[in-house]
Amino acid sequence: MAKEWGYASHNGPEHWHELYPIAKGDNQSPIELHTKDIRHDPSLQPWSVSYDPGSAKTILNNGKTCRVVFDDTFDRSMLRGGPLSGPYRLRQFHLHWGSSDDHGSEHTVDGVKYAAELHLVHWNPKYNTFGEALKQPDGIAVVGIFLKIGREKGEFQILLDALDKIKTKGKEAPFNHFDPSCLFPACRDYWTYHGSFTTPPCEECIVWLLLKEPMTVSSDQMAKLRSLFASAENEPPVPLVGNWRPPQPIKGRVVRASFK
């Protein structure tokens, strides 16, 4: 069997390029954001979403993350504006987190690591299929939201309560009537740059919108996320933690801010 990628020392991020050479490409994500080097671009528009809660379908544990999957067969749940030239369809969201509250995000801001990072993955329907969009530099738009520790977030608890049904790798459960915009912070300011998926194959097809303001969750809520397993039901238990890729070289890319 081919070596499967993961986050351990033998198959972790420093090995991904062995199977997926683009992981050493010029437009890889995540990156470190150095705010003093980021320019405000007054041409950047506000962004907005119109998500249909009925498009949420399932929640699953694939051994790498927990993912919520949406119906993207037509323009039901859409992201518009910002740096984007047209509307993008929501396909899924997932999270990256650490083994403790002091790290877990993939992007960092002036050296600050957050407890987790939420990625909402959208694709450009002008390319007809998600698979085709993966081959285009503007095929995918990801809204990234940092999670910091503070007071509990009730809307996040809805997601966490579903985790009991997907404790182990390979489990999937219905997850309906959820509008992920309930997780968004009040402030819509963002940074944007061109990058990649942060998991193999690490395709360089992403317009990133990283929100400046994190959402706040409690330490107990983070502990619940870390109660998932990367192992299947019949295997020795392996906790699902530390599923983050460290920042990659920026290689001359420009990060723009929607705010001064």
Curated annotation (Swiss-Prot):
InterPro entries: CA_dom (IPR001148), CA_dom_sf (IPR036398), Carbonic_anhydrase_a-class (IPR023561), Carbonic_anhydrase_a-class_CS (IPR018338). Induction: Repressed by 3,3',4,4',5-pentachlorobiphenyl (PenCB) and 3-methylchlantherene (3MC). Inhibited by acetazolamide. Its cofactor is Zn(2+). GO terms for molecular function: carbonate dehydratase activity; nickel cation binding; phosphatase activity; zinc ion binding. Its EC number is 4.2.1.1. The modification S-glutathionyl cysteine is found at residues 182, 187. The modification N-acetylalanine is found at residue 2. It is an enzyme of class 4 (lyase). The modification Phosphothreonine is found at residues 73, 129, 216. The modification Phosphoserine is found at residues 29, 43, 48, 50, 55, 219. It catalyses: hydrogencarbonate + H(+) = CO2 + H2O. One of its GO terms (biological process) is response to ethanol. Zn(2+) binds at residues 94, 96, 119. The keyword Acetylation applies. Reversible hydration of carbon dioxide. Expressed at much higher levels in the adipocytes of lean Zucker rats than in obese Zucker rats. Expression is higher is the adipocytes of male Zucker rats than in female Zucker rats. This is Carbonic anhydrase 3. It comes from Rattus norvegicus. The gene is Ca3.
